[in-house]
């Protein structure tokens, strides 16, 4: 999770204001911290290996998968569960993105979130979760697992530019993609699909387009 439970934080503040600090839920801190998403999965399935959470906003799930890939690659584990979840449709979540002017103001459902369109004006908030099982290749083959895909490269970089805007030249994101391709030993022309961030905001889509062009030529 990138933000933990905003709802728990809201409920805690409301309880402080209406009934005093002594009436706050004693579990409010575990509910708020981001690593509880991974912790609850660990408890549910009895997984007792490495259990961490990366909190990097919209890149959280991808970075968690990348870290799980590295854990297997380094020999720390044979199997890892990795993914992300977010549930931030609540007053503070909506208000925060509204103040950022990141949410679409369109009343037309077909035009409310239109990434890379010249008339884009923001995104529509959603909630969801997704988890993948990563497994060392020989371990998966030996037990007859149904292998759906193989992770062969991973790149992660920082723009060191601004707290809400990507680097204007797309250099940071481009280098992450180039690093992943180098590790995978694939050429740009071999890539058939790019899963873009595509927030439908003016700056993100513009700078992300530049990043893709830099990485793929």
Regions found by a protein language model. Name each.
Residues 1-56, 85-94, 188-206:
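Conserved beta-ketoacyl condensing-enzyme motif
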Residues 3-21, 71-74, 94-107, 168-169, ...:
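A glycine- and small-aliphatic-rich helix-loop capping segment at beta-alpha/alpha-beta transitions
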Residues 26, 30-34, 38, 61-65, ...:
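Generic structural signal for well-ordered, non-membrane alpha-helical segments
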Residues 34-86, 124-145:
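Active-site-proximal alpha-helical scaffold in enzymes
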Residues 41, 61, 68, 97, ...:
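Conserved small-residue
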Residues 64, 176-184, 211, 215:
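Stable alpha-helical structural segments in soluble proteins, enriched in small hydrophobic residues
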Residues 78-121, 154-168, 196-205:
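Acyl-CoA/ACP chain-elongation machinery
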Residues 108-186, 190-193:
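Condensing-enzyme catalytic core mediating Claisen C-C bond formation in acyl metabolism
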């Amino acid at each position: 999770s990138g933000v933990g439970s905003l709802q728990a934080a809201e409920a805690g503040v409301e309880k402080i204001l209406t009934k005093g600090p002594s009436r706050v839920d004693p579990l409010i801190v575990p509910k708020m911290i981001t690593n509880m998403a991974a912790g609850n999965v660990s408890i549910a399935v009895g997984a007792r290996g490495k259990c961490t959470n990366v909190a990097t906003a919209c890149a959280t799930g991808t970075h968690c998968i990348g870290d799980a890939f590295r854990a297997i690659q380094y020999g720390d584990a044979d199997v890892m569960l990795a993914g992300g979840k977010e549930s931030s449709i609540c007053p503070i979540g909506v208000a925060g993105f509204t103040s950022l002017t990141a949410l679409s103001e369109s009343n037309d459902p077909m035009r409310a979130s239109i990434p890379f369109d010249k008339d884009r004006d923001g995104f529509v908030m959603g909630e969801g979760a997704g988890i993948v099982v990563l497994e060392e290749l020989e371990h998966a083959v030996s037990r007859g697992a149904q292998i759906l895909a193989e992770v062969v490269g991973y790149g992660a970089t920082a723009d060191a530019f601004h707290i809400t805007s990507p680097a204007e030249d797309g250099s940071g994101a481009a280098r992450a993609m180039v690093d992943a391709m180098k590790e995978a030993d694939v050429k740009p022309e071999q890539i058939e699909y790019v899963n873009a961030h595509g927030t439908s905001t003016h700056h993100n889509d513009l700078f992300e387009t530049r990043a893709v062009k830099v990485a793929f030529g």
